[in-house]
Amino acid sequence: MMKKIQRFGGAMMAPVLLFAFTGIVVGLASVFTNTQVVGKIAEQGTLWYNFWYVVAEGGWTVFRQMPLLFAIGLPISLATKTNARACLETFALYMTFNYFVSAILKVFYGIDAAKQIADGVTGYSAIAGVPTIDTSLFGGILIAALVVYIHNKYFDKK
């Protein structure tokens, strides 16, 4: 059991390694767009500000799409065979799950998740552009674990 927990912990490192670099990028962009640090060159509308704003948005990608990155990153270490295929399977199932949840909210409960997100209602998020319930990292990890289990168990079955 301890080996499985250690293996899972090691698998969590793949997505976590992205945090350091993107955190530095976001931090630098925040400093360079602060008028108290850089001066008038960092005011909105200047070329300097626009450049660092674009850099910051690129840096925020990892933090905004964490559930997706964890869902795709876990099979890299946890799948025993053809881990790239397991990653693709996980991505497909995770996105399908989010589309299902979005459709269920709309059809059965009359909730437009996109409107809820726009209105700032908590509990909703857009994952890769799909408005859905905010399952945070837990949803991505749970789907990844399910897919890896099924993949490892049935990949070689005929």
Regions found by a protein language model. Name each.
Residues M2-K158:
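Early transmembrane hairpin of solute transport permeases
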